[in-house]
Amino acid sequence: MIIDTTAVQDMNSFSRLQSLKEVSGIIWMLVPILSLVLGITLGVLVIVWLEREISAGIQQRIGPEYAGPMGILQALADGIKLIFKENLLPSRGDTRLFSIGPSIAVISILLSYSVIPFSSHLVLSDLNIGVFLWIAVSSIAPIGLLMSGYGSNNKYSFLGGLRAAAQSISYEIPLTLCLLSISLLSNSSSTVDIVEAQSKYGLWGWNLWRQPIGFLVFLISSLAECERLPFDLPEAEEELVAGYQTEYSGIKFGLFYVASYLNLLVSSLFVTVLYLGGWNISISYIFVPGLFEITKVGRVFGTTIGIFTTLAKTYLFLFISITTRWTLPRLRMDQLLNLGWKFLLPISLGNLLLTTSSQLLSL
């Protein structure tokens, strides 16, 4: 049997072309994901530096100044130090739960970034249930903290994990009710649709003015979800040494801090998206909607402006969160639970009923 060499070469060339197409498709799929991860990492480093500088200013002392200009590389130096430190395991603890707990906390929060629109053309996944995906995946993080506390075989760690679970349950319900109110106003649960619904009326179309009660409840609940002062009961130093982090060292110890700042950043981004108009500058006389959609260069320029606008609003909320941490005292556990169940839950439920009534009357 004689085989035509030309046909064989054509088949080999076709198979190589198909392989190259598959590889290029995988690369193009990974590029936005890796870009998002890189941007999030830089955002966390900036937040750590900002917190140290702001806390130094509030306490009238000198902040980080040796690692890089103005100490901006101090967080990177701390991360490298933790990578090379020894990872200790508790002798009588559950090593599997102990090891997997920090990873669950970080991964569950990272998934939330997939539905955040940084601009009209920069969102990893525009889902119809975007805001509720955030609630769903963020509720997994306390499970990781509880696993870490239980696997440590330490009473302080276990108590810290229990507090994290109780705090998460108490404040996720008001948070969800606020999200329902926003979804009713926007007639959608997609984060992109919510931002576009606010852009119709400029600055006065922000949900901040239409939902002031919901904004305050969302603000307090998001701070409690991030376990920031005055809501850092799961890791109260005076009572629980370091809570669920007590037995951790090395990179696993660093993962908890990364998860904390990731959660703070994603909460700030959702405040921007849900209440502050997202990527819209909201100056209708200067920036006409659709102005940057005419050419490719215009779309790139508009996307860049949208990213900077989103980040500016986000870091404004971050400044408020950091200032709150260094100015307010910690609540007791009973005060924390009473605030969530006796005050925020009825207020958020009443806000949802008012929103529903107004939407029905407007039909």
Swiss-Prot record:
- EC numbers: 7.1.1.-
Is Mitochondrion tagged as a keyword? no
Top EC class for this record: translocase
Q: Which residues cross the membrane?
A: 30-50, 98-118, 129-149, 165-185, 203-223, 248-268, 269-289, 300-320, 334-354
- Molecular functions per Gene Ontology: NADH dehydrogenase activity; oxidoreductase activity, acting on NAD(P)H, quinone or similar compound as acceptor; quinone binding
- Look up the domain of life of the source: Eukaryota
**Catalytic activity, per the record?**
a plastoquinone + NADH + (n+1) H(+)(in) = a plastoquinol + NAD(+) + n H(+)(out); a plastoquinone + NADPH + (n+1) H(+)(in) = a plastoquinol + NADP(+) + n H(+)(out)
GO biological process annotation, one example: aerobic respiration
Membrane topology of this protein: Multi-pass membrane protein
Q: Please tell me whether the keyword Zinc-finger is annotated for this protein.
A: no
A GO CC term? chloroplast thylakoid membrane
Keyword terms = Chloroplast, Membrane, NAD, NADP, Plastid, Plastoquinone, Quinone, Thylakoid, Translocase, Transmembrane, Transmembrane helix
Q: Where in the cell is it found?
A: Plastid, Chloroplast thylakoid membrane
Function field: NDH shuttles electrons from NAD(P)H:plastoquinone, via FMN and iron-sulfur (Fe-S) centers, to quinones in the photosynthetic chain and possibly in a chloroplast respiratory chain. The immediate electron acceptor for the enzyme in this species is believed to be plastoquinone. Couples the redox reaction to proton translocation, and thus conserves the redox energy in a proton gradient.
Q: Which family does it belong to?
A: Belongs to the complex I subunit 1 family.
What is its quaternary makeup?
A: NDH is composed of at least 16 different subunits, 5 of which are encoded in the nucleus.
Q: What is this protein called?
A: NAD(P)H-quinone oxidoreductase subunit 1, chloroplastic
Q: Which organism is it from?
A: Oenothera elata subsp. hookeri
| Name of encoding gene | ndhA
